[in-house]
Amino acid sequence: MKNVFLPLFSFFYILINCFAEENIVKSTISAMSPEEKAAQVLMMGIEGKKIFPSYLGDYFGPYAPGAFILFGYNFSDTPQASAAYIKSVKQSIQKLSKAEKFIPPFFASDFEGGRVYRIRKIASYLPAPKYVAENLSEDDALALYTHTAEQIALLGIHLNLAPIVEKGKTMGIGFLGDRLFSHDKDIILKYSKIFIEGMKNGGIISAVKHFPGNVNTDPHLSKSVIDVDEETFYKEFVDLFKEIIYDSDGVVLISHVEVPFIEKTPFCFSKKGIENILRDKLKFRGLIITDDMAMKALKEGGRSTSDNVISAISAGCDMVMCSEPRFRELITIISNKMKTDNSFEKRIDEAVFNILKMKMKMGIIDESCMPIEKNKFNEKKFYSAKEAAEKILKKNTN
């Protein structure tokens, strides 16, 4: 009899804890001002590489962005200095915050490998995805990504904006090149899963991108369109992502590509694409973030960054990435719309809920939504992980 009731008791215990945790998150959100909620849905770029620039105090003011995206210029020449910079940003934002309950930002960057690897000067080398898939065994690839993630995490970073889960021959995606694992679906799936598992082992969350895919037009430069029928769209684009994100609670980064048969608008603005396909058909329960709102693919027709941010959130994106210095402007635009549009306010609450749940998963806040103080940079652990990664690379180049 004991064996029958123990699993049942465990199930109800977990269920009760989940409900309690969700209620705490919801009560935390209800206590936030519209401006604080608006700040949470923004992933902003930031200047500096050594300490938090004092002149940014007035720019950020009393509000803490939900996240920061770091570029190559944000990393110093040593891991110690880079970790100190990230710590300085977090501490400075906390001092500036006037929130009753401070919610720390998470830090994200691109660590795909090869030409897209922001810490190449201070960490072990990470080859391009194509090289890894062609030259490393599954075990070596997993170990390499694990040890790379350990270094990334020790710097104070939480989210890797990778891997790219796309096929190179689909619509001739030439501009991505060796950033793709392969042209073969099975190899892409195998090494994408290895990448995500390795990052997780090392303490890093992965954002699979760029859902639902790309064509041979770089959205940084101009409008991009997937002009195919529904059957081809699912077979050549969505099915790859489905294998990775079905019933998942991770992170998905949305492309700016347009899919006309769904809606003649960038996918990040398409409620039919995000809600009907990603949420409903693929059962994705995690965090949805956009690519950079500053890309030229979104600027056509005279649209402003503010317009784009509102459109992306309204469509179902939880967090918008913006490398332009528009933090205060965007907070004002978002919070003003919340005050006059009940459905938009509800959408923001849903987005902030997903963000806070992800921050719990990242270990940034606890079940009570209180900040968790992480350990300081550990030089010994960093160089140990760096050495372990370099040994794997050396073995595979001899």
Which residue ranges define each predicted feature?
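Positively charged n-region of N-terminal signal peptides that target proteins for export
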Residues: 1-4
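Hydrophobic faces of well-ordered beta-strands that scaffold small-molecule active sites
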Residues: 39-46, 66-70, 105-111, 159-163, ...
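Surface-exposed loop and adjacent secondary-structure segments within mature catalytic domains
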Residues: 121, 125, 129-130, 146-235, ...
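Second-shell residues forming the walls of enzyme active-site clefts
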Residues: 33, 59, 78-94, 98-101, ...
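Active-site mouth loops of central-metabolism enzymes
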Residues: 41-51, 130-142, 222-235, 296-302
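Preference for extracellular/luminal or secreted protein segments
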Residues: 21-62, 271, 281, 300-398
